[in-house]
Amino acid sequence: ASDVYKRQVNMNCTFVDNNRIDIGSNVLIASNVQIYTATHSTKVDERMVQDCPEEQEICRTYALPVRIEDGVWIGGGVVILPGVTIGRNSVIGAGSVVTRSIPANCVAVGNPCRVIKQIDNIVSV
C-alpha cells in the first residue's frame, strides 16, 4: 500500500508558523482560513518585556503547535488558535473559531467552536 498525502489549501489562507503546523493526508482547507501558532500571556505584566528602551515596545511571545489530522475538512473563514488538534475525519463549519481541540469523527461549528454532531459510518479514503 502506498501513502497518500493529498492536501488542498484554497486561496487567501494565513499560516503563522512560529511552531509546527502538521497537516495530515486528504485534508481540505477552504479559502480565508487562518492558522495561528503564536500567542501571548493574558496577564499584562507577563506580556510586556521589562527593562526595554521606551522607544521599543516588546511583547513576550510563545508558540504552540497546531495539528490537523487525516481526512479533516475546514470550512471557509475558520480561525484555528495555538495548541489545537483537530481529530481525524472531522468537519469544522465555516466561520468557526477553534479555541480548543476537536475530537475525531465529528462536526464542530461556532465561536467558540463546539461539537454538534458525531459522524457515523465513516469510509476511510
PLM regions with names:
Residues 13-15, 45-46, 52-53, 58-59, ...:
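A short linear-motif detector with a strong N-terminal bias
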Residues 1-5:
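Short, small-residue-biased leader/transition segments that mark boundaries at the very start
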Residues 6-11, 16-25, 30-31, 36-37, ...:
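Left-handed beta-helix
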Residues 27, 46-48, 98-99, 104, ...:
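Short, intrinsically disordered/low-complexity patches at protein termini
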